[in-house]
Regions:
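Structural signature of the Rossmann-like NAD(P)-dependent dehydrogenase/reductase core
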Residues: 9-10, 87-88, 141-147, 192-197
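Conserved glycine-rich Rossmann-like NAD(P)H-binding loop of the short-chain dehydrogenase/reductase
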Residues: 27-43
Length: 245
């Protein structure tokens, strides 16, 4: 594990993202919380600093290229490089819509597109913007917070009782594939790119119905963010090991 690193966590002001930030800070790393609301991001950063962490916040809306570019510029100006990018920001459905309303037979394509904007295109936008800073690191790594809900092995199993959600589930399938594309493309650059599944965690994303705590859900991302320079790349794991593609 790297002794000290600069890490950015998108969606880091609450839920799993907050816990990822907290756990990385507890390990002695400098953490930048990316949040759509700078006020909320700074509030979380202040709380984590009060607990002894080196934590700051930056305004970052993953669906807004201008916001992402401004965040990358600020991080570059203040730190000069980035060691770990944790693409944690994600949504399950469009505000005001029902997650259960994503059945393919009745799904609204605009709803599906809205989910993909954050869960897939947002990750690509952020990763592309921060790649120059990651290239300046001695041990760069990218961690994408995906979900076993998008596992092709799981969703092709007709005995699977998980919700059929045309927006969320395929967005996580796509995110895992995006992870592999980056892992292969950046392999020769020695940038480690991996996907993790936090598990079914009680957060705003699922109405706090999850069975695990955010602290437990953060463990897989923190573990992958702190792997050594010769660690794995192109993997999809949870705290128990590999997740079926």
């Amino acid at each position: 594990m790297t002794d000290h690193m600069i890490a950015l966590v998108t969606g880091g002001n609450k839920g799993i993202g907050r816990e990822i930030a907290a756990q990385l800070a507890q390990l002695g790393h400098t953490v930048i919380i990316g949040a759509r609301s700078l006020e909320r991001g700074e509030q979380t950063a202040a709380e984590l600093r009060a607990a002894g962490g080196s934590v700051t916040a930056v305004a970052l809306d993953v669906t807004d290229p201008a916001s992402v570019a401004a965040a990358a510029e600020r991080v570059g100006a203040e730190y000069g490089h980035l060691d770990a990018l944790i693409n944690n920001a994600g949504i399950s459905h469009q505000p005001g819509a029902d997650f259960a309303g994503q059945l393919p037979r009745t799904a609204d394509v605009d709803h599906v597109r809205y989910v993909f904007e954050t869960n897939v295109f947002g990750v690509i936008t952020v990763t592309s913007a921060f790649l120059p800073l990651l290239r300046r690191s001695d041990s760069p790594r990218i961690v994408n917070v995906s979900s076993s809900a998008g596992s092709l092995a799981a969703i092709s199993d007709f005995s699977n009782t998980d919700p059929i959600a045309l927006g969320y589930v395929p967005s996580k399938t796509a995110l895992t594939a995006v992870t592999m594309m980056y892992a292969r493309d950046l392999f020769s650059d020695h940038i480690l790119v991996n996907a993790v599944c936090p598990g079914f965690v009680a957060t705003d994303l699922n109405g706090h119905r999850g069975l695990s705590t955010p602290a437990e859900g953060a463990r897989s991302a923190v573990a992958m963010a702190t792997i050594p320079a010769d660690g794995p790349t192109g993997t999809f794991t949870d705290v128990d090991g590999p997740v079926a593609w």
